[in-house]
C-alpha cells in the first residue's frame, strides 16, 4: 500500500491540495495544530485567476457555486461584489471610480466559509487530524516520518508544508530562512453591528459593495464586510501606513517584535493618531477613542518570506515540498497571498496526480511551473503596499487623470 502524502496545515492551501488529491483517490492526511473551532473570520479578495484555477481543479464548478458558499453577503443573495472605488476618508468624496462596464474580477470570500466550502467540495471526506503540532520531519523523498508533540508518528511518501509564514516544517528543514519584517504599520479591528445599524451607518456610503475603501494622506482606512447573518453584520477595519521610524525618529505604532499578548492591546498612540486624522463619516463613527476599546483589535506585523531554488531543492531531497505562505509569504495588506496559495495547491496536486511513482519529477515540475509566479508576487507585494498608501496629492492627480480619460472616452463615443 502506498504511504499517504502528509500535509502540514489546514489552511487554504493545505485543504485545497488535500481536497484535489482526495478527489483523485490519492491517499493523504492533513495535520493541524489548532482545534476544529479555530476562527479566521475575516474576508479576503479572490481574484479571477485564483478562483478560476480552483473551480477548474474541483471539476469545472460554476462561479455561483463558490459565491453561494463563501460570499460575505450570500444570505442576501450577494456575490461578494466590491465596487473598487476609492474615497477620501477626510471628506467622504469619491476619488477614483471604477469603469462601470468593467466585469467583476474580484470576489470577496469569508475565510472560514471558504475553508469549509473547499473541504466539502467532493464526495469523500478529507482526513484532517486536529491537535497535531509538528515536532520533527525526517527522511527522504518517498519515505518520510512526521512526529508530533502529542506523541503521534506517521510515515508518508511526501510532506507538503502548508503551515504558513511561521512554518514549522521550514524552520526545521531550512533553519536559515526566516521571515523579513516589512516596515509598515497595520492595525486590524473586528466588530459586530445589528443589521439595522449597519444599514443606517454603512450602507448609504458603501451601497452593495463589500468594501468601503477610504484613503487618506499616506494612510488607509478600509471597512469591509466579513459576514452577514439574519440579525447582525460582522465587519472589520484596518488602519495602515508606512512606518516613519528611522535612526532619528521612533514610530510608536511600529512594533515589529510585539508579543502575541501585546498585539491585542490598543496603544494610546493609535487613539491619538486616529483622532488627529479628522475622519469623515462613517469612518469617524467606528474609528474613535470610544468605539475602539469595544472592538477586537490586533497589531498585524507584515512579513515576507523568500527562498532560493537551492533551498527548495535541499528540502526536496528530504521529502518536503512547500506551498503557500511557507515559501512566499506576502504582506496581508496589498498582497495576493491567498490567491497564490490556492494556485500553488492546484498546481502541486496536478503535478502529483498520476505521478505517485515519481514524486521527485512531480515536485520538480511543480517548482518549475510556480517559481517565477511566486517570486515576482513577493516582490510586487512589497511595492503594492506603498502604492496603496500614497500622499493625497497623488490620489488627487490620479482622480483628475481618470476624469479626463472618461471625458475623452465620452467625446469619442459621440
Curated annotation (Swiss-Prot):
Q: Which InterPro entries match?
A: FAD-bd, FAD/NAD-bd_sf
The family this protein is said to belong to: Belongs to the paxM FAD-dependent monooxygenase family.
Q: Which residues form a coiled coil?
A: none
User: Which residue ranges run through the membrane?
Assistant: none
Binding sites annotated in the UniProt record for FAD: 32, 43, 115, 325, 338
What protein name is recorded for this chain?
FAD-dependent monooxygenase adaC
Q: Does the keyword Flavoprotein apply?
A: yes
Q: What is its EC number?
A: 1.-.-.-
**Sorted alphabetically, which keywords does the UniProt record give?**
FAD, Flavoprotein, Monooxygenase, Oxidoreductase
Q: Which cofactor does it need?
A: FAD
Q: Which GO terms describe its molecular function?
A: FAD binding; monooxygenase activity
Its pathway is: Secondary metabolite biosynthesis
Briefly state the protein's biological role: FAD-dependent monooxygenase; part of the gene cluster that mediates the biosynthesis of the linear tetracyclic TAN-1612 neuropeptide Y receptor antagonist. The decaketide backbone of TAN-1612 is synthesized by the non-reducing polyketide synthase adaA via condensation of one acetyl-CoA starter unit with 9 malonyl-CoA units. The FAD-dependent monooxygenase adaC then performs hydroxylation at C2 while the polaketide chain is still attached to the NRPKS adaA.
Any keyword Hydrolase? no
Q: Which Pfam families match?
A: FAD_binding_3 (PF01494)
Enumerate the catalysed reactions: 3-(2,4-dioxopentyl)-3,6,8,9-tetrahydroxy-1-oxo-1,2,3,4-tetrahydroanthracene-2-carboxyl-[ACP] + NADPH + O2 + H(+) = 3-(2,4-dioxopentyl)-2,3,6,8,9-pentahydroxy-1-oxo-1,2,3,4-tetrahydroanthracene-2-carboxyl-[ACP] + NADP(+) + H2O
Amino acid at each position: 500500500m502506498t504511504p499517504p502524502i502528509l500535509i502540514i496545515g489546514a489552511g487554504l492551501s493545505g485543504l485545497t491540495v488535500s481536497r484535489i488529491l482526495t478527489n483523485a483517490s490519492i491517499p493523504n492526511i492533513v495535520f493541524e495544530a489548532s482545534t476544529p473551532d479555530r476562527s479566521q473570520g475575516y474576508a479576503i479578495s479572490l481574484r479571477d485567476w485564483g478562483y478560476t484555477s480552483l473551480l477548474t481543479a474541483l471539476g469545472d464548478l460554476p462561479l455561483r457555486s463558490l459565491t453561494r458558499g463563501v460570499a460575505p453577503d450570500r444570505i442576501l443573495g450577494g456575490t461578494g461584489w466590491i465596487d473598487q472605488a476609492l474615497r477620501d476618508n477626510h471628506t467622504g468624496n469619491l476619488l477614483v471610480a471604477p469603469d462601470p462596464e468593467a466585469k467583476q474580477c474580484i470576489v470577496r470570500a469569508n475565510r472560514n466559509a471558504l475553508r469549509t466550502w473547499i473541504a466539502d467540495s467532493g464526495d469523500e471526506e478529507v482526513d484532517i487530524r486536529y491537535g497535531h503540532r509538528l515536532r520533527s520531519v525526517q527522511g527522504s523523498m518517498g519515505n518520510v516520518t512526521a512526529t508530533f508533540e502529542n506523541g503521534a508518528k506517521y510515515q508518508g511518501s511526501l510532506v507538503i508544508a502548508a503551515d504558513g509564514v511561521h512554518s514549522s516544517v521550514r524552520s526545521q528543514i531550512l533553519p536559515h530562512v526566516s521571515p523579513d519584517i516589512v516596515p509598515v504599520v497595520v492595525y486590524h479591528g473586528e466588530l459586530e453591528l445589528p443589521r439595522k445599524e449597519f444599514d443606517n451607518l454603512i450602507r448609504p456610503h458603501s451601497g452593495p459593495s463589500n468594501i468601503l475603501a477610504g484613503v487618506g494622506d499616506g494612510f488607509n482606512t478600509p471597512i469591509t464586510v466579513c459576514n452577514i447573518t439574519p440579525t447582525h453584520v460582522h465587519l472589520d477595519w484596518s488602519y495602515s501606513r508606512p512606518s516613519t521610524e528611522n535612526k532619528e525618529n521612533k514610530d510608536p505604532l511600529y512594533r515589529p517584535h510585539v508579543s502575541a499578548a501585546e498585539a491585542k492591546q490598543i496603544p494610546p498612540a493609535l487613539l491619538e493618531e486616529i483622532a488627529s486624522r479628522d475622519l469623515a463619516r462613517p469612518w469617524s463613527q467606528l474609528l474613535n477613542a470610544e468605539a475602539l476599546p469595544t472592538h477586537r483589535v490586533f497589531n498585524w506585523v507584515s512579513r515576507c518570506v523568500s527562498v532560493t531554488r537551492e533551498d527548495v531543492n535541499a528540502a526536496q531531497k528530504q521529502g518536503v515540498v512547500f506551498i503557500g505562505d511557507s515559501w512566499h509569504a506576502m504582506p496581508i495588506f496589498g498582497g495576493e497571498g491567498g490567491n497564490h496559495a490556492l494556485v500553488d495547491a492546484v498546481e502541486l496536486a496536478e503535478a502529483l496526480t498520476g505521478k505517485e511513482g515519481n514524486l521527485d519529477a512531480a515536485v520538480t515540475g511543480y517548482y518549475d511551473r510556480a517559481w517565477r509566479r511566486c517570486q515576482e508576487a513577493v516582490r510586487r507585494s512589497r511595492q503594492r503596499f506603498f502604492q496603496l498608501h500614497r500622499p493625497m496629492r497623488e490620489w488627487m492627480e490620479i482622480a483628475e487623470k481618470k476624469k479626463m480619460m472618461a471625458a475623452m472616452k465620452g467625446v469619442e463615443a459621440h
